[in-house]
Design a protein with these regions (language model features):
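Non-catalytic, surface beta->alpha helical segment in thiol-disulfide oxidoreductase systems
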Residues: 129-151
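Electrostatic cytochrome c docking/interface patches
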Residues: 170-187
Length: 214
């Protein structure tokens, strides 16, 4: 049931894996405490940083330092559980053991992880929540320069840095490749996204054409 609910909330799957200059697409996931985290709600923030859950103390320390420095400047931080396991209590204990206090997005179906192009366990992403444009993808240790540029209002091409961390195992690639827009995606958008992504809605853009949906 959790995987089905997660799938229903991920309208952004229509975008596929993002490239430089492309929008990430809006999405929503349930976090490890059972709360829905809808990315459109953060469009008043300066930036959003998402990093997969990690057992690396160094990566956790880097993320914590960034949070302590930039959260007060309007940067929202999330951890992402890319289908590693669905036990929320275990996730909570693992996060606490790393000294982190962040919402963990439970991507049981791995759709958001795929859509963001995250393929390694230390591969963080940075995006502009007002435009949903991806600005950085790579190790969390190398993200700060891009974050500073984003906060300064600089315009730049997406920065992509290679990762040497363990790869994320994707169990559902074949199933996701066979998704139908008409049968699988359009009903999700109509039920979960259209009320916000419309003229006058709270989302940053209206889903009123095939281009904006993609």
């Amino acid at each position: 049931m959790k995987k089905l609910l997660g799938l229903a909330l991920v309208a952004a799957v229509v975008a596929g894996t993002v490239n430089a200059g492309e929008r990430v697409g809006d999405f929503a996931l349930i976090d490890h405490q059972g709360a829905i985290q809808h990315m459109a709600w953060y469009n008043d923030h300066s930036a959003v940083v998402i990093m997969p859950m990690t057992k690396s103390q160094d990566d956790a320390a880097s993320l914590k330092a960034l949070q302590e420095t930039y959260a007060e400047q309007g940067v929202q931080f999330f951890l992402l559980n890319p289908g590693l396991h669905s036990d929320r209590a275990l996730v909570q204990s693992e996060v606490a053991a790393l000294g982190l206090d962040l919402p963990v997005l439970m991507d049981d179906a791995q759709l958001v992880t795929e859509m963001l192009g995250v393929s390694h366990i230390d591969e963080a992403v940075l995006y502009d929540p007002s435009s949903f444009e991806l600005l950085y993808r790579g190790p969390i240790a190398d993200i700060e320069a891009s974050l500073k540029e984003a906060l300064a209002g600089e315009k730049f091409e997406m920065v992509s840095v290679a990762s040497n961390a363990p790869a994320i195992e994707f169990a559902n690639l074949d199933a996701h490749a066979n998704l139908s827009y008409e049968k699988d995606i359009a009903p999700i958008i109509a039920e979960n996204c259209a009320s916000c992504h419309r003229d006058g809605g709270i989302a940053p853009f209206a889903m009123d054409s095939s281009i904006t949906v993609q």
